[in-house]
Structure formats: structure tokens, C-alpha cells
Curated annotation (Swiss-Prot):
Species whose genome carries this gene: Dendroaspis polylepis polylepis (Black mamba)
CDD domains in the cross-refs: TFP_snake_toxin
Additional detail: Negative results: does not bind to muscarinic receptors CHRM5 and CHRM3.
Family listed: Belongs to the three-finger toxin family. Short-chain subfamily. Aminergic toxin sub-subfamily.
Annotated protein name in UniProt: Adrenergic toxin rho-elapitoxin-Dp1b
Any Pfam family matching the protein: Toxin_cobra-type
Role noted for this protein: Highly potent on various alpha-adrenoceptors (ADRA) (subnanomolar affinity for ADRA1A). Order of potency is the following: ADRA1A (Ki=0.37 nM) > ADRA1B (Ki=10.47 nM) > ADRA1D (Ki=104.71 nM) > ADRA2C (Ki=165.96 nM). Were also found to reversibly bind to muscarinic acetylcholine receptors (CHRM), but the affinity is much weaker (CHRM1, Ki=1778.28 nM; CHRM4, Ki=4466.84 nM; CHRM2, Ki=17782.79 nM).
GO cellular component: a single term: extracellular region
Length: 65
């Protein structure tokens, strides 16, 4: 499985997930109004949202774009 790790105006950076990590995730952490810190990558299980986080998990190639 290939997941997106970062995204910018120059394109996306991806990683091949290691064995046992068969989900891609995208975490949006609320910082201030209209500003989010976004983290992407591979995980074995979908993380539980904390505080002001929004988490999306998926199982297809680059689905966390």
C-alpha cells in the first residue's frame, strides 16, 4: 500500500507502508480558525481523534491525499 505523507504546491510525497500497516490516514489538527496542521502516513489501526483532531482512514492507494 502506498500512502501520501505530505502535499504541497510542488506535488505529493508518498511512502510504501511497511508490513502490518495496511491503512492510510490523514489527521487534521485545528490550530486557529481556518488553519489546520495536517499529518498523513501509514498506520496499523486508525488513530482515535484527540482534542480538535479530525481523522480519516482508508485502504486504497494514495487515498489520504
Amino acid at each position: 500500500l502506498t500512502c501520501v505523507t505530505s502535499k504541497s504546491i510542488f506535488g505529493i510525497t508518498t511512502e510504501d507502508c511497511p508490513d502490518g500497516q495496511n491503512l492510510c490516514f490523514k489527521r487534521r489538527h485545528y490550530v486557529v480558525p481556518k488553519i489546520y496542521d495536517i499529518t498523513r502516513g501509514c498506520v496499523a489501526t486508525c488513530p482515535i481523534p484527540e482534542n480538535y483532531d479530525s481523522i480519516h482512514c482508508c485502504k486504497t492507494e494514495k487515498c489520504n491525499n
